Amino acid sequence: MSLIVIIDGHTHRYADEVIADPVKFALSQKESHWLKLVTPTQGKGLQGWSDRKEMLSQMKTDGVDRAILQGWYWENPTSCVLQNEWHAKWIRQDPQNFIGFVSIHPSIKDPLDELKRRQDQGFSGIGECHPWVQGSTLRDEIWMQCMHFAERAGWPVTFHVTEPVGHDYPGRVSTPFDDFLWLAQEIPTLKIILAHAGGLFPFYELNPKVRPDLQNVFYDLAACPLLYEPQVYRQLIDVVGYEKIIWGTDYPLRIMPKTQEKPDFASFKNLLHNEAKLSSKEASAIFGGNILSILP
């Protein structure tokens, strides 16, 4: 398989002090929701941790050229600004490897100023967003101002999507499908990325009354091996087209815990390629071309 560039469209990275003691960080920042997700209730948890050296080494080993650093949907607006500072440092430090997305909260002081500041620092999108965890909704006026900013900047916006039925886990918060359709209708030129296979939202594109409104909606595959059977990948491609699918791992999550001792990129890359029986054209698009095409 010969590709020009391979990009993981959905990763997370944390500062060294967070990796050293995530519980201390969560308690000091009042991030109870995040803490539920990253600390195991029993046994070895799914959450892995990776500093700069480890992440770059794993990317090199697994043949990943670049990674999008998604922000988190923090409950505390100061945590969003703090993460944006981390991302600003990291994309300045390793611009050839990392692409920064902005973490946003409706209660940040002057959120549009925060977005403009990060745009000037070289950020390329907003995400990962989950307004409902932050006590808001996508239809909130401040959220919509941020969405219009992204549209004008040519930025994609990544949303966490929770499937409406199925998995239950600590910290699960619903993400209404209606709101994503509404957003696509309100700002049709906004590039929207629905994470985690969109919680299977893309299958609504089989509805001819819905599909025309979703031309700028894309779907990343972050954490999908944890969620769905492997035939879902080819089915997604057949329904929406390979041009709308973005490979992402949710690194450093261990998304294939039965085979992964530590987080990596190659496990899911190989699974996707083999299970979906990707052509070279499909692989080139899904593993990098599609996300590149919607970055500013």
Residue ranges and their predicted role:
Residues 12-17, 74-77, 106-110, 133-134, ...:
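Active-site environment of divalent metal-dependent phosphoester hydrolases
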Residues 124-125, 137-247:
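Catalytic pocket-lining loop regions of alpha/beta-barrel enzymes
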Residues 54-58, 83-90, 114-118, 142-146, ...:
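A general structural detector for well-ordered alpha-helical segments in enzyme core domains, enriched
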Residues 10, 59, 87, 118, ...:
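Conserved, mostly hydrophobic/aromatic
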Residues 40-46, 129-137, 222:
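The substrate-binding groove and active-site-proximal loops of carbohydrate-active enzymes
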Residues 65-165, 169-171, 218:
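Active-site gating/metal-coordination segments in enzymes
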Residues 41-44, 76-78, 164-174, 256-263:
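Short, flexible/disordered intra-domain loops and linkers
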Residues 2-9, 16-61, 65-66, 234, ...:
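Mid-to-C-terminal alpha-helical segments outside catalytic/metal-binding sites
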